[in-house]
């Protein structure tokens, strides 16, 4: 994931900062506890595509 892209894009739900999880190929919003998939290098920033992070999952 290009670090310049991470500086530009934001969570579509709260407009918060996203961080990249290299292991799971996901963009993480810590504020909303959502993980957005990255498919073929393309972030899928659709709320209905995101998975909720369990309370015990730390990223």
Curated annotation (Swiss-Prot):
InterPro entries: Trm112-like (IPR005651). It comes from the Bacteria. GO terms for cellular component: cytosol. Pfam families: Trm112p. Transmembrane segments: none annotated. Belongs to the UPF0434 family. This is UPF0434 protein plu1633.
